[in-house]
Amino acid sequence: MPEIDSQKLQEAKDFYRDRIKGWMIADLEKSLLAETNFLTALGCLVYTEIIGIFLPPITTESRDRNMARFYRAFYRLRSSEQLEFLDTAILRETNKRLYQHLRHNMAHKYFPTIEKRTGDLVLFIPSVVARDGISSIPDAIVPPVFFSNDEVGQTRVVIAFRNYIDELKILVDESMIKTFEENEPNYQASAVSGVDVVLRGALR
């Protein structure tokens, strides 16, 4: 692996501290307190993609650059196993992944629409935005996005944005430790590459 540019690594550290923690995470926490539910959920999805720019590739990378960035962070969240299960189930049902439904539709339609096309018919898997995801099982980790049944037993997808913020904060803290304290080469290389993307407009 080539030698890490120390100046760019410092720029990446500054970006993590000033913009990711000081701006993005702080904005999400303020938005949570202000109860701007849909705006908070949208911020979680958009910031997941931005954070992913600074993280190493995962085993199964999408050829779509933006989707790849999203999943580099999304699949590193604390509840990644449940999120991968949900993503696979949605892909199997709709031929599209969660990124294509939730991230795209929240940004462009301001609603987390999940569509399933069957011939000329367009069916919708219900989805809702909620502040909290709560489990009846003590100490269970409730992922930021999950399947749930509504009052009449219909399956829906829930985006629980307090859970999402909590897991993003953990991811950012862990990534900073791996990058700037434990000096893991793949994390440092990705952080430096992320600086080129975000601050210099390079492609990655």
Predicted regions and their residues:
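Polyanionic, low-complexity intrinsically disordered segments
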Residues: 2-23, 27, 94, 110-204
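Hydrophobic core segments within long, regular secondary-structure runs in both alpha-
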Residues: 21, 25-28, 68-71, 100, ...
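Residue-level detector of alpha-helix boundaries and kinks
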Residues: 13, 32-33, 87-88
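Short, mixed-charge amphipathic alpha-helical segments
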Residues: 71-105, 109-117
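Short, contiguous, well-structured surface segments enriched in hydrophobic/aromatic residues
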Residues: 30-80
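Aromatic-acidic/polar surface patches that form glycan- and anion
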Residues: 17, 33-40, 91-92, 96
